[in-house]
Amino acid sequence: MNTLLLVEDEKIIRQGIRIMIERSGVEIKEIIECNNGLSALEILKTRPIDVMFTDIRMPKMDGIQLVDEIQKLDHKPLIAAISGFDEFDYAVNLMRNGVTEYISKPVDREIIKKTLEKFNGVIEERESEQSRRKKVAYQQLQYMLFYDDITKVEIENICLKSE
């Protein structure tokens, strides 16, 4: 995993979650911290983020609004929502809008670890699929470039298969 965005308005809680993330054993190249949803959205607009852990209740822009805004972006991170409110309606609304995990406060280190491991597995699967698609596209391109007797119909069929 390259980047994780941690969005939590309470500094002590944010620091505690960061320590749990760092000690999880899951390799993360960069952890970025924000204290509100608006700052997080600005970061998400400027660079790809693999995973985001976000609080629900925050100033300026809460986690629910942040998750809604993320749906408009091209690159969407895997999202875990963290909340002190154990309300079913919150969880359902967030899950419908792209949140994969809902973590209740107080945050448990094992839940953080399992969530990171799950997200890391999803990221590895995505990267493997992208690599496979690139390899197939490269092979198809080689075929089209090196065979002089290839027909227009064959080229169109190859292009249709790669979509």
Regions found by a protein language model. Give the residues of each.
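Receiver (REC) domain active-site loop signature in two-component systems and cognate sites
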Residues: 58
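Two-component/phosphorelay signaling modules centered on CheY-like receiver
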Residues: 11-32
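Helix N-cap/capping motif at the beta->alpha junctions
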Residues: 33-42, 63-66
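Interdomain helical linkers/hinges and coiled-coil/dimerization scaffolds
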Residues: 107-163
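Active-site residues of response regulator receiver
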Residues: 8, 55
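Conserved phosphotransfer cores of two-component systems
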Residues: 45-48, 70-76, 97
